[in-house]
From Swiss-Prot:
UniProt similarity note: Belongs to the TSC-22/Dip/Bun family.
Assembly and oligomerization: Forms homodimers. Forms a heterodimer with TSC22D4/THG1. Interacts with histone H1-2. Interacts with GNL3.
Region (Leucine-zipper): 77-98
Sequence ranges of Low complexity compositional bias: 115-144
Subcellular location: Cytoplasm; Nucleus
InterPro entries: TSC22/Bun, TSC22/BUN_CS
Protein name: TSC22 domain family protein 1
Main location per the UniProt record: cytoplasm
Function per UniProt: Transcriptional repressor. Plays a role in the repression of hematopoietic precursor cell growth. Promotes IL2 deprivation-induced apoptosis in T-lymphocytes, via repression of TSC22D3/GILZ transcription and activation of the caspase cascade. Positively regulates cell death in response to TGFB3 during mammary gland involution.
Protein source organism: Bos taurus (Bovine)
Entry keyword Repressor: yes
One Gene Ontology CC term in the entry: plasma membrane
Claim: tRNA-binding is one of the keywords in the record: no
Amino acid sequence: MKSQWCRPVAMDLGVYQLRHFSISFLSSLLGTENASVRLDNSSSGASVVAIDNKIEQAMDLVKSHLMYAVREEVEVLKEQIKELIEKNSQLEQENNLLKTLASPEQLAQFQAQLQTGSPPATTQPQGTTQPPAQPASQGSGPTA
């Protein structure tokens, strides 16, 4: 019988502390000091203030960790953007080179494949093979 009586009292005390904690926490967030929002000077009031301070410290810690993580992620994304821009530039240069080295027949065949939607895998190795690049290097060889 005694254990049944202690449980409601302990629960009531917990609810009382939680209610005062919630009021204290909300008032600190709102920055208001209303007459209706006051903590008593008892030990429960001091523990509420201590808990309130711990929560604020934890929130500050979480905030600083999140800010650090966001800064790190921004740096990673900036680096990825820089790498993608460089790769895009390189691919554009290669594309322009292949266009200049490809014969008109190869370009026409490639355009036809793009329009029909068939994969350009059969013409792509022909455009990227070494023989078209060799005449260009041979042409620059005698002039040097």
